[in-house]
Amino acid sequence: MKKITGFFLLIFLNFSCEQDESYKQVLTDPETFQAAVKQLTDVIVYDIFSPPVASRIYSYPSIAAFEVIRHIDPSKYRTLAGQITDLTKAPEPVDEVNLHLASLHAYLTVGKALIFSEEKMQTYIDKLYERLEDKGLPRSVKKASLAYGTQVANHILEWSGGDMYKQTRTFPKYTIQDEPEKWKPTPPDYMEGIEPHWREIRPLVIDSAGQFEPIDPEAFSLEEGTEFHRQLMEVYEVGKSLDEEQTAIAEFWDCNPYVSHHRGHAMFATKKITPGGHWMGIVAIATRQAGNSFDETVEVYTKTSISLFDAFISCWDEKWRSIVIRPETVINQYLDEDWLPLLQTPPFPEYTSGHSVISRAAAITLTDYYGDDFAFNDTTEVEYGLPAREFESFLQASEEAAISRLYGGIHYMMAIENGVDQGEEVGKFVIANLKTRKEAQEATF
């Protein structure tokens, strides 16, 4: 009888130990971090942040998470402090800290501080920690890990406060200029220009907003035979004769966070991910497909989000320097007042194409990790009612994202082609000057 009792006691103790340790399986699972990123994306969509601002919201939480999780293997990872502008070293972890939990907490804490709907993030956080407690997370480990995560989050938030974002909220709005070549608000809502002072935001890796200034746009002209007129007519004619594939490409890469719809006197809007959010979705696909660990997943999100952040600064610097008029405005005024682009024209100047710049920068970064033949099925837009698209590489995806803006009727080819070149320069500069690994460690998968 004693032997039988002892046998069942042993089984019970083993089961209890497994239950007590199961929280570690949740925390080391990269899907736990993937879910946190998805939650942040969902709130960004809900709060309708503009593409440049969304890139800021993606980058700072990722940096916070990386600065924690890098301690999981000090022989492998290096700090971003000293590599990113003005960033100093974050506090070091102490005993009893679970680095996966601390990294998650740093990510969620910084993310919550940067969005409007804090209650949505807090609800997610509360449910996550409740789940971990149910899986046996010890109170002492939770307390130490959250305390450390908060320390790092506060360090990143204090540093982020010096990037001129708050100051630019009070800067004057763009004053519409009368010159025919200058950008004007576009239908249907004629919204004010978004982020005309984004060039003032402190870059993370590039030296300055104007470091990779593209060549000048073609001079405005309605005279036949001029390059501007040729490109204008190209947008007009392509828009009138789109085939099924071109339409699908344009819609897949629309990524407009706020599209208004007018029906008589009624107006409603649809919300979608930003262009940067789409590339965060591609990071999710790539890291899952490659079987990356939790720390590797954080690493790839971090470097890609940094490339996106700097690419938006570079692009917006040119947009609000050249202030090029959109095709829709010129076509409606001089060629065809009834012509409509397939996509709703975003409320900011035309040159260069944001999709072209940021997609190329992200693709260069991801190619550095996974190679130039990493085929994937892009399901990012499925939840928004669009079918998945297959790509042979990240660069191919970025090229399709770029040309989609011609099909959408919102960009001239000069903005697309020169935007790709601009994004390539940004991406190459980031991978050359930002190292997440120690010298002996190859950051490829």
Regions found by a protein language model. Give the residues of each.
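Sec-dependent signal peptide recognition
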Residues: 2-8
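Enrichment for repetitive, rod-forming helical segments
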Residues: 9-10, 412
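C-terminal motif of bacterial Sec signal peptides marking the signal peptidase cleavage site
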Residues: 13-16
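A periodicity- and composition-biased signal for non-globular, repetitive helical segments
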Residues: 8-9, 361
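N-terminal hydrophobic targeting signals that begin at the initiator methionine
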Residues: 1-2, 18
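Acidic/polar surface patches and capping/hinge elements
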Residues: 18-445
